[in-house]
């Protein structure tokens, strides 16, 4: 993986509803955690195919300071409802923090255009890597 230079400070993750945790502040954890931010939608087939990798990375690297946060930015209106999102998280076995980004505020702040997209934020709060789509899992882990 070729890391980007430290030019882009990661925007804070704000949202309508948080699941599996209280709101996560990257600023409060600066110097402690590397963040993997997964932009996804539970109704997106490509996003569902990435979940085993995201969950595996969380399991393998959380003790080394990796913090995974899902940003659920729905494509369809039916995906906006908190109860529906909560049910999807339970059915998919997602236990890491997820924020509902119904108005695409976080999506736009990061300049995301495609589902799924993974963003790696270093311990200093800079965006160092961004990856779109279903491929490149092994590259991402290097």
Language-model-derived ranges and their functions:
Residues 9, 35, 40, 67-69, ...:
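Conserved Rossmann-like nucleotide-binding pocket used by diverse enzymes
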Residues 31-35, 64-67, 93-96, 123:
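Loop/turn elements at helix/coil->beta-strand transitions in domains of secreted/extracellular proteins
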Residues 90-96, 100-142:
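Thiol/disulfide oxidoreductase modules built on the thioredoxin-like
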Residues 11, 45-46, 52-56, 63, ...:
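Proline-centered helix-kink/hinge sites
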Residues 18-23, 40, 57, 72, ...:
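Tryptophan-centric aromatic hotspots in well-structured domains and transmembrane helices
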């Amino acid at each position: 993986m070729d890391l980007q230079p430290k030019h882009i400070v990661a925007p804070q993750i704000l949202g309508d509803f948080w699941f599996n945790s209280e709101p996560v502040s990257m600023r409060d954890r600066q110097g402690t955690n590397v963040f993997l931010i997964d932009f996804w939608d539970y109704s997106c087939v490509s996003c569902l195919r990435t979940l085993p990798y995201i969950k595996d990375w969380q399991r393998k690297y959380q003790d080394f300071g990796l913090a995974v946060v899902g940003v659920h930015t729905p494509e369809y209106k039916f995906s906006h409802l908190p109860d529906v999102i909560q049910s999807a998280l339970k059915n998919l076995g997602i236990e890491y923090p997820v924020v509902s980004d119904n108005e695409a505020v976080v999506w736009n702040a990061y300049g995301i255009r495609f589902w799924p997209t993974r963003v790696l934020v270093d311990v200093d709060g800079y965006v160092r890597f961004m990856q779109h789509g279903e491929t490149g899992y092994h590259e991402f882990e290097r």
